Structure formats: structure tokens, C-alpha cells
């Protein structure tokens, strides 16, 4: 499934074709994108998804829940900080452009906390510029995922951080 994000506009799905293509691979037996071992290794992981878009939060929650992850969501950086303290996630996805406390500030606060500094943070953004990626690294993020992202990209990003 792909999600297109346009700054200041609504999100739109292009999921039917991707879903049909993936289903065809599984039925024909031509390379299920996520191996059984990868799915098992994701089972039980606590993941926090921080994004001001309800569509992105729901989509990530649905995809990750199907893989056995325990998913928590937050609408902005302030909400995320309280959820991090309450749930102690194994991995955090943070959107860059959010109201009140943006993704860079949120990541920086997480990485400056003695308890949570080792928690992997993956930045999410519809912007794919070198400056944005560099700024994410400066504040401590481990990886940068550009929207729209596929299920494979989302799960691959998690696998890169937990393995």
C-alpha cells in the first residue's frame, strides 16, 4: 500500500493495485515480501507511531498490528513524550512536520533522555531532501523513511533497527 502526502492537503491511497500485486505473489508463491522469520521477530515489539495525520497513524497501526506488533499512536511530540514514558516502546516512528513540537525537537528530547536514548527513532517525512535527512541524523535519528512508504519499506526499517 502506498500513501501519498502533500503538504497542506489530504492524503490519498493507492492501495488496491499494491494489495492485489502482493496477494498474487503470496498465492502464486513468488516471494512473499516479508519472510516468516521477519514476521516472528516483529511479534511483541512495542512501536510508537507519532504523526499528526490520522490516516498515517491508522495505516501504520493496521500494518504493524498484523505483524504482531503492539502499536501506540500519538498526534504530536508532546503526546509522544507522555506515551513514551507510559509504554516504553522498542522503536519510534516520528513525523517531521507536526504542530506544537515537531519531529526534530521530539527526537532530540528522546535522545537526550538517559532512559530512552538507546530507543531507535525513525523519521517520517514527505520531504526527501539531503538537508532533512542530515538534520534528522544530527538530532539522533537512526533512519529516515520517506512518505509515501510501502509495507515492505515500513517493515524493512523496523528489521534494520532490531536486528
Could you describe each region identified by the protein language model?
Residues 58-66:
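Charged docking surfaces used in two-component/phosphorelay signaling
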Residues 68-75, 83, 145:
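Short hydrophobic/Thr-rich beta-strand motif most characteristic of the beta2 strand and flanking loop
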Residues 87-93:
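Active-site beta3 strand of CheY-like receiver
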